C-alpha cells in the first residue's frame, strides 16, 4: 500500500529539538499537511560551541518553510545567525520589530563575551550582520501567510517585543506561547489571552507548580537587600542580561534611590558594552509597553535615569567604596558580571543578587547552592564569602497564571516545553488532576523529551466555495453546479472557466479538435442516421459546403471522399465526437444501412412546398371545399360532417370529436400525405 502524501495526511507532528524537558535552546518543529515550521532557534546557556545548539541534525533545514522567533533571549534566538548562514535553510523568518532591533545588539554582545576560541564560535559578527537581511518583521495582530500557513502574533509580556504566535494550517490552529507572563510589571503589559481558541497549545513550564510572590513584596525584598549590602559598605552585584529584566530592575532602583536621599552618594552602574544602544532601543519602543509607560512618556522618558550611570567596561570603573553594579551576562558564564564576581566574592561585605531564572550548568545556578569555594575562569579556587540572594524577577508564568491561561483557552491538546524535567512532570500531573473530573473539558497534556515526537490526528473537512459567475444566482435544491475545482494551499473554490483569470494566475485556453473520416455515402443519409441518434441535427452551409451541427457542439462538414469533424475539446464534447465518429464509420462500412433506409432522406423538404402540394392533392380527392389550412401546420379535411386534422410536420392524423369511428377517412388522409412525402424525397 502506497504511503499517503504528506499534504493529504491527517497527522500533525510536534517535535522539540531543544527545550524538551529542559530550559535552553528552544527549538520546536511543527509538521502538518506537508508544511514544516520551526518555532525559535536558541542556544543552551550552559553549553558552548556546537554542543549548545538544538538537535538540528535530525532535520533537513531546506525543508523548513517558516521560522518564527518569539523574543530576543539567547535561549530562543541565539542559534539563528548560525541557522540562517551555515545551513541549507531557504524559508522565511519572522520576528517583531523590537525583537529584531534588540537581537542585533544582544547577539553582538554574545559574540564578544563568549569565552571560547574563534574556531569553536558558531558564527561571527559578519554572519550576524548578514542574517539581518534575511529576517522579516511582523506587527502584533497582523495576519501573514507563507506557503499556505497563516500566522499572527499576540503580546506575550516577558520582555520587550516578546510574541506568542498563532499558526493556522488547513483550519487547525496552534498557539505557541514562547516565554510569557500574565502579570503586568513596571514597563510591560501582561500577555494577551487570544479570543480564538487553538486546537493545540505549546506552552512554557519554567516554574512548574511554583507560585510567585506578590510583585510589591518581591520589589521590597530586592530593594531592602540592596540597601543592606551598601549599608555595610559592600558592593552589590546584580548579574542580568543586557536587555529584558535589567530594564525593570533599573526602573525599581532609580525610583528607590530617588525616594532615599541618604543613598544619593552611592553610585549605581549599568555595566554592559550594550548599555547605550540598549537604552536607545527601549526609549524608541515605548509604544510596545504598558499604558503607564505610554502615559508617562508624554511628561518624561522613564528610561532616562537620574541615579544610574552606564559602565562600558572595567577600565572605566573606580572600585572604591560601596556601589551597586548591574552587569551582564545574567548567568555569569563570562563577561563583566563574571569579572566582578571573581573580584568581589572573597569579601563578606559584598553581595550578589540572582534576579532571574538560572539554567543548570551555569555559575549563577552553582552559587545558589552556597558552595564554600568557586573556580575562576583561569582555574583558580576562591572562597565564596559574599552573600548570595535569589529574588526572582523572571517574567515567566507561575502555576496560577499558567492554569488560568489554559482554563481560558480550553485547548484539547497541551504540549509542555521549556521546563526542567521534574518541574514539567509536576505541572503535567497538576493539570491532569485539575481536569480529570471535568466531563465538559477534555485536555490531553504532553511533555515530550528532546527529539521525541508528539503525533496528533486532525481530520479537516474539505469545503469548496462557489465563486464568481457561478455564484451570481442562488442555487435551487437539487440543482447541479458544474465548474472547475481550484485548490490553492488548503482552500478549495469552484469557478466557471471564464473566471479563472480573475481568481487565479491560470490562463484560460481552448483546444479546437479537427478529425477527418473517410465517407463516400450520401450526406443526407448521414444526416438521417444522426437525427435518429440525437433527435436534433441542424443543417448548415460552411464555405458553400454542406454541414451538420450535432449535439449543438459537433460540426460535421462534407468534403470530397470524407467528412471533417470540428469541436472545442472538453470531456463532454469529446464523448459526443466519439459517438458521431462511430455513426459515420458504421454508415460507411455497412451497406445494409443504405438499403434498409425506409425514410427518404434527400435534401430537407421545404414545408410550404409540401403543404401546398398536399392541399391540391387532397382537394382532387375530396373536393375543393372539403380542404382547409389551419395555423400553417394543420390541414383539415371535412367529409359528410366528419373532420380529420393532418399535422404537416409529423404526418399524423387526428379525428375531431364525433368523427373517431370513421377510420377510413383517417387512413385515406394519412396514406395520401405519406405517399406525397415519399415522392418529394426520393432515395438516391
UniProtKB/Swiss-Prot annotation:
- Give the protein family: Belongs to the metallo-beta-lactamase superfamily. RNA-metabolizing metallo-beta-lactamase-like family. CPSF3 subfamily.
Taxonomy-wise, where does this protein's organism fall, top ranks first?
Eukaryota, Metazoa, Chordata, Craniata, Vertebrata
**Covalent link Glycyl lysine isopeptide (Lys-Gly) (interchain with G-Cter in SUMO), residues:** 462, 465, 545
Keywords tagged on the record:
Acetylation, Disease variant, Endonuclease, Epilepsy, Hydrolase, Intellectual disability, Isopeptide bond, Metal-binding, mRNA processing, Nuclease, Nucleus, Phosphoprotein, Ribonucleoprotein, RNA-binding, Ubl conjugation, Zinc
User: What Pfam families does UniProt report for this protein, alphabetically?
Assistant: Beta-Casp, CPSF73-100_C, Lactamase_B, RMMBL
- PTM section of the record: Sumoylated on Lys-462, Lys-465 and Lys-545, preferentially by SUMO3.
The record's section on Gene3D superfamilies has:
3.40.50.10890, Ribonuclease Z/Hydroxyacylglutathione hydrolase-like
Record's SMART domains? Answer: Beta-Casp (SM01027), CPSF73-100_C (SM01098), Lactamase_B (SM00849)
The listed locations are: Nucleus
Phenotype when changing residue 354 to T:
In NEDMHS; uncertain significance
Q: Which residues carry this modification: Phosphothreonine?
A: 681
Give the record's GO biological process terms: co-transcriptional mRNA 3'-end processing, cleavage and polyadenylation pathway; mRNA 3'-end processing; mRNA 3'-end processing by stem-loop binding and cleavage; positive regulation of G1/S transition of mitotic cell cycle
Catalytic positions are: 396 (proton donor)
Protein name, UniProt field: Cleavage and polyadenylation specificity factor subunit 3
Note the subunit structure: Component of the cleavage and polyadenylation specificity factor (CPSF) complex, composed of CPSF1, CPSF2, CPSF3, CPSF4 and FIP1L1. Interacts with CPSF2, CSTF2 and SYMPK. Interacts with TUT1; the interaction is direct and mediates the recruitment of the CPSF complex on the 3'UTR of pre-mRNAs. Interacts with WDR33. Interacts with ZC3H3.
- Residues bearing Phosphoserine are 659
Q: What is its EC number?
A: 3.1.27.-
**Primary localization:** nucleus
**Protein species of origin:** Homo sapiens
Enumerate the residues binding Zn(2+) 2.
Answer: 75-76, 179, 418
